[in-house]
Swiss-Prot record:
One of its GO terms (biological process) is regulation of division septum assembly. It holds the Pfam family MinE. It comes from the Bacteria. It comes from Buchnera aphidicola subsp. Acyrthosiphon pisum (strain 5A). This is Cell division topological specificity factor. HAMAP family: MinE. The keyword Transferase does not apply. Belongs to the MinE family.
Length: 83
């Protein structure tokens, strides 16, 4: 019976791990699906303005929009500046 218990408990652990991973994936997809239609263009325009004044690669700039409440959104801009 111990052998059977070992395999059954492992399946539960594997199922829990798979469930947690799926929840992370779904949360990430929801995060990007909730973006307004104008957001990709906003990202491109912000990047072009920054590149006008500072010589940086596009992957050095991240723009995120977080919805805190129904009426509050936070635009977060992170830029890695060269030395």
């Amino acid at each position: 019976m111990a052998l059977l218990d070992f395999f059954l408990s492992r399946n539960k652990n594997t199922a829990n791990v798979a469930k947690e991973r799926l929840q992370i994936i779904v949360a990430e997809q929801r995060k990007y699906n909730n973006e307004p239609d104008y957001f990709p263009q906003l990202k491109r325009e912000i990047l072009s303005v920054i590149c006008k004044y500072v010589n940086i690669e596009p992957n050095m700039v991240t723009v995120q929009l977080d919805q805190k409440k129904e009426d509050i959104s936070i635009l977060e801009l992170n830029i890695i500046l060269p030395d």
